[in-house]
Amino acid sequence: LVPISLNDINSQTHFHFFVHLVFALGSMSYITHSGYGYSKRLCEDVSVWFLDKFFPRHKIVVEILHRGLKREGVNGYCDMVGYAYRPREFLIELDTYMDKELYIKTLLHELVHLRQWVVGSLRFRYGKLCYSKEPVEKYEYWYQPHEIEAREQEETLYLEYLFEKNGWTDRQVAQFFPNRLLQAV
């Protein structure tokens, strides 16, 4: 037997936590969440599902902050943090007072914006926010192309998330998504 000091146990614990975090995510992404009035498990589950699905090999850092946003009249925000060129660090702010369905859809909506930033379709050009090289400031909020895409995809992603988490088959998914091809008929 080899004697183990308290410092060895602490360092092993931190190392184990780090390794567990990396393998649990399946990707090299790092997600933190804070605030009040939300389900930590649901927040992690949806975020990890999205990042594993769309960015399994990217190193993305996401901080999800839950706070009261009613005064601002929004359910959520997604902002890049740090460098504008190839952003990989993001802050997502979510309202704390949402039911489960609205919470998941809002988080997915903001994660779609994260994807837009990562793939480069949403970026700053000459100090203006642009989507596919077109400034979005000339549109009202509801008609901005990046918001239209996020609203369309949040519904589809919500159903995909529920189907994958509930173990539905391809046939059951095809009932809701008729444009999906079935592998085996």
Name each model feature, range by range.
Residues 140-143, 154-185:
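Long, well-structured alpha-helical subdomains associated
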Residues 38-58:
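Zn2+-dependent metallopeptidase catalytic core
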Residues 101, 117-148:
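Post-HEXXH active-site segment of zinc metalloproteases
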Residues 72-101:
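Active-site scaffold of zinc-dependent metalloenzymes
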Residues 105-117:
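Active-site recognition of the HExxH zinc-binding catalytic motif
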Residues 114, 118, 153, 157:
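Short alpha-helical functional segments enriched in proximate histidine and acidic residues
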Residues 1-11:
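Extreme N-terminal basic, low-complexity initiation segments
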Residues 15-18, 23:
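Aromatic (phenylalanine/tyrosine) cluster motif
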